[in-house]
């Protein structure tokens, strides 16, 4: 088809021909101060998309409470375009699928109160075999601006190294180029990057870590790992959710206002999920302050699905201006306990039963970084009820269910010390301190694996709080706290935990060694609230 649209000259679509300072999104979080919420067709419909689907989805979201709850983005995924570009090099929509065109659809979506997003690929072809953006980045940016697009998901299929670059360097070049182009636009697009996902399933995670290092500099969110299971896919939908959940726990250090880790879509109508499992995905994503992008047949969502998807207390957690990602306070074979701070000074605790049996147990407040000498008010964010707690929270959970509590603190008990697991992200093993010895073991939920890190970088285990993690040469141990440099540690965006005295980095299996570059054995996850050196 011929392109029927109002063209905006590139000089107008971009800010100007004058030099423009390109700033990282994390330096200008006002572009996306909280994670995006909305709809994308891919996990539910894949390439079976058309104008009718998006009109009906828009109408349903405007009337069923989703728009009012904050889901204000309508995003197209792959397969919306023709297999060939126009003679002038521009992309064209498939006129059979979108007879009135994407500019018309964008206007319709916006007339209902939504923003409009689109999909492209950084390589020479999209994952579905349609034209990629490589070599056409500026004309595609111009096209999207003309169509009223304000959100771009840029995939990473069909990328091949050129000019002596490694594959990781090629991705950085392509996504960096898009970042420059988008940053110069009068109205910069929200930029969703899929680059990390293409490095997430290798045994050596150095390239994955490296890509994760640079994506916050270029965009507002990044798909860090494998796709969530699609509606027609084979396998367990719950296992797929758990895979993406676990990947998200590995990258908390990167998240901050203006940049969000993306564990992929909410698959709210997947037939393989129980209601508890659907609610768990939503609660975990909200606790992460992750994007809440629903991929489902919106007009047919049940009242039960709409009820949890519009839970205002959990949406408020997701949209909290701190954007702090919940991290692991404790983990064993059945329970994960996650914590984070909220902007109003309260503490969030999220408890996931990933085991196969129902569980009833107490969650001690000290593993959440709170004092056991204080009394707190804890609000159940599912039901809204409030209870007074001291020492612990009593919870009862069905298999694959998740509880979420907001714990209010008063002035006398407002201090929160970052507390939780220190774990190697490649092996999943937890740093464990017993008596004077320190090593790496399977996570078992014991207090010998739960650490507190104070503002000076001193680290102590909850099981023996008078003893601190100490480096001496290449050995580590628990020694009486004395505030010497061998007991002071710094945490970097690369995941390295570096000792101030030796200059060595914590290494999986026990001990410290010369700091490597993004090596599997030296990348660790730490509790939310620990200072991260950029």
UniProtKB/Swiss-Prot annotation:
InterPro entries: Aldolase_TIM, Glyco_hydro_27, Glyco_hydro_b, Glycoside_hydrolase_SF, Melibiase_C, Ricin_B-like_lectins, Ricin_B_lectin. Residues 1-25 form the signal peptide. GO terms for molecular function: alpha-galactosidase activity; carbohydrate binding. It catalyses: Hydrolysis of terminal, non-reducing alpha-D-galactose residues in alpha-D-galactosides, including galactose oligosaccharides, galactomannans and galactolipids. The keyword Glycosyltransferase does not apply. GO terms for biological process: carbohydrate metabolic process. Pfam families: Melibiase_2, Melibiase_C, Ricin_B_lectin. Its EC number is 3.2.1.22. GO terms for cellular component: extracellular region. Its main location: secreted. Disulfide bonds join 47-79, 127-157, 430-443, 468-481. It comes from the Eukaryota. It is found in: Secreted. Keywords: Disulfide bond, Glycoprotein, Glycosidase, Hydrolase, Lectin, Secreted, Signal. The keyword rRNA processing does not apply. The active site is at residues 155, 213. Belongs to the glycosyl hydrolase 27 family. Hydrolyzes a variety of simple alpha-D-galactoside as well as more complex molecules such as oligosaccharides and polysaccharides. This is Probable alpha-galactosidase A.
């Amino acid at each position: 088809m011929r392109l029927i649209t109002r063209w905006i000259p590139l000089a107008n679509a971009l800010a100007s021909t004058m030099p423009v300072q390109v700033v990282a999104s994390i330096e200008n979080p006002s572009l996306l101060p909280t994670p995006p919420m909305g709809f994308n067709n891919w996990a539910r419909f894949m390439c079976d998309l058309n104008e009718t689907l998006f009109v009906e989805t828009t109408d349903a979201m405007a009337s069923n409470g989703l728009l009012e709850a904050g889901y204000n983005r309508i995003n197209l995924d792959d397969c919306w375009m023709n297999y060939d570009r126009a003679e002038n090099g521009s992309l064209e929509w498939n006129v059979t699928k979108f007879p009135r065109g994407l500019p018309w659809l964008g206007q319709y979506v916006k007339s209902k109160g939504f923003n409009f997003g689109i999909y492209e690929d950084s390589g020479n072809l999209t994952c579905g075999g349609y034209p990629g953006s490589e070599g056409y980045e500026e004309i595609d940016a111009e096209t999207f601006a003309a169509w009223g697009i304000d959100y771009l998901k840029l995939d990473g299929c069909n990328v091949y190294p050129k000019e002596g670059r490694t594959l990781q360097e090629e991705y950085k070049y392509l996504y960096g180029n898009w970042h420059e182009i988008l940053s110069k636009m009068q109205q910069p697009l929200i930029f969703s990057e899929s680059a990390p996902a293409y490095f997430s399933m290798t045994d050596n995670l150095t390239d994955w870590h490296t890509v994760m290092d640079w994506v916050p500099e270029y965009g507002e969110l990044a798909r860090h790992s494998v796709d969530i299971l699609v509606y027609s896919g084979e396998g367990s939908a719950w296992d797929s959710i758990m895979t993406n959940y676990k990947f998200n726990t590995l990258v908390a250090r990167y998240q901050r206002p203006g940049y969000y880790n993306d564990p992929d879509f909410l698959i709210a109508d997947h037939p393989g999920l129980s209601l508890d499992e659907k609610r768990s995905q939503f609660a975990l994503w909200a606790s992460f302050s992750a994007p809440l992008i629903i991929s489902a047949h919106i007009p047919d969502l049940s009242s039960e699905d709409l009820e949890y998807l519009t839970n205002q207390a959990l949406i408020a957690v997701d949209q909290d201006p701190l954007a702090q990602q919940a991290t692991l306070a404790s983990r064993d074979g059945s329970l994960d306990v996650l914590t984070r701070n909220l902007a109003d000074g309260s503490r969030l605790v999220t408890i996931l039963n990933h085991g196969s049996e129902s569980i009833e147990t107490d969650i001690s407040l000290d593993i959440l970084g709170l004092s056991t000498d204080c009394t707190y008010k804890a609000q159940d964010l599912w039901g809204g009820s409030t209870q007074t707690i001291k020492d612990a929270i009593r919870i009862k959970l069905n298999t694959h269910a998740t509880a979420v509590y907001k714990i209010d603190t008063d002035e006398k008990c407002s201090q929160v010390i970052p507390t939780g697991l220190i774990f190697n992200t490649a092996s999943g093993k937890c740093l464990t301190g017993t008596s004077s010895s320190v090593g790496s073991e399977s996570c078992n939920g014991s207090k010998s694996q739960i650490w507190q890190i104070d503002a000076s970088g001193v680290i102590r285990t909850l099981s023996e709080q008078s003893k601190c993690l100490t480096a001496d040469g290449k050995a580590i141990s628990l020694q009486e706290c004395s505030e010497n440099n061998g007991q002071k540690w710094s945490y970097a965006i690369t995941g390295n935990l570096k000792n101030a005295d030796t200059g060595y980095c914590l290494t999986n299996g026990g001990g410290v060694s010369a700091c490597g570059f993004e090596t599997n054995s030296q990348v660790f996850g730490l509790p939310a609230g620990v200072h991260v050196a950029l």
